[in-house]
Amino acid sequence: MFKSGSGSLKRSGSISSVKSFSGDSEKGLPPISRGSVSIASQNSEPLIVPASSSSFAATSDFVPEKTKSEGNLKDKSSVITGNFGSSGPINAHTNQNADGDRLVENLLLKESSKGRGSGTSDARHTATDSRLSQEVKQSFSEENAGGNDLNTGRGSHGTGDGVEQHYKFDCEEGMSAYHKRVVDTFFKYFEYSAEDGHSTLYSDVMFLSGHGDLGLLVMSRYQELMTLRVRSAIYGIFCYLQALTAYLTYFDAKVGQAIMLDEELEKYEIRLDVAQDDDPIVFQITTGVFTSGVAHDLRKLTQILEAFSLER
C-alpha cells in the first residue's frame, strides 16, 4: 500500500527509481545493461540513494542529463500532449472506455500491420505481431462490468512466492480501470521469450520526496521472471504516474510529453508540466541493447503514452 506522509512538499527534491540487471553466469549470459527511470525537477539536485545491496545501484550514475539545447531536442522530438492525472479529467478515461479502447486498438493494430522492416524481421516478433491483433481485439471487446477483474495474463510472470501479489497491492491498487486495461494488453504483447531464455530481474523501487517532509512514500522490493526488460520500464512508468497523482497532488500534472531523445541509444523522456510551476518534471527512461527488438518495443511504449493523450 502507498504510505502518505505529512507536511509540505519541497520542490527541491526528486523522485527516483533505479533498476539494475544481472545476467546468468552459469548459462553464460552476460549482464544486461542497467537502465533507470527517474523523475527530477530541472532546477534541483537529484536525491542520491546509496547502494544498499549488490543488486541496488545508486542513482548518481543514472540521473537524467540536462538537455544540450532545446533546438536539438525539438529536431528529434515526437511530442505527445494530454492529461496524465488520476483525478478529475483522468476519470473521463474510465467513463469513456469506448473512445480510449478504440484509440489504443487502432494504435497497436496500425503499428502491427506496418511490420518491422528489414532491421527487425525477427521471427519471434513476427509471431507476436500475428497474435497481437487478436489479443487486442479480445481485450477491448470485453466490457469491464465490474471494474476490478483486470489483471488477466499476468500470473505466469510471477515467481510463485507472492512477489507478484505484493507488487499488485503496492503499485496497482489505485490505477484506474482504463490504465489497467491498457497495461494488461501491452504486457500480453511482450510474452515472447528472450533469445537466451528468461532473465531474472532484481528491482529495488523507491519513491522518495524532498528533504523528508513527506518522507518515504513507497519502498517496495520485488523480483520477477521477465521475458523482456522493457516490461520493467512500463511497471515504473505507471507506478510513478500513480504515485504522483495519488500522493503528490501538489504537482497536479496536467500535460505530458513523450520525447525521443536518442533513438540509437534508446533514450526517452517524459515531461510532466506542473500547474504551479513553470519547471516541468523530467521523467526519463534509458536502456541498453538487449535484443534486436528493444528499439521497436520502446516505440510501442511511446504509443501507450499516446493513448493517454486524448484531447478533452
Swiss-Prot record:
Q: Indicate where this protein resides in the cell.
A: Host cytoplasm
* Low complexity compositional bias, start-end: 1-23
Q: Keyword annotations for this protein? A: Host cytoplasm
Transmembrane ranges, per UniProt, are none
Region (Disordered) residue ranges read: 1-37, 62-99, 111-161
GO-annotated cellular components: host cell cytoplasm
In what ranges is there compositional bias, type Basic and acidic residues? Answer: 63-77, 122-134
Ranges of Polar residues composition bias in the record: 78-98
Family named by the database record: Belongs to the phytoreovirus non-structural protein Pns12A family.
Give the function comment from the record.
Constituent of viral factories. Binds to ssRNA and dsRNA.
Q: What is this protein called?
A: Non-structural protein 12A
The species this protein belongs to is Rice dwarf virus (isolate Akita) (RDV)
Q: What is the lineage of its organism?
A: Viruses, Riboviria, Orthornavirae, Duplornaviricota, Resentoviricetes
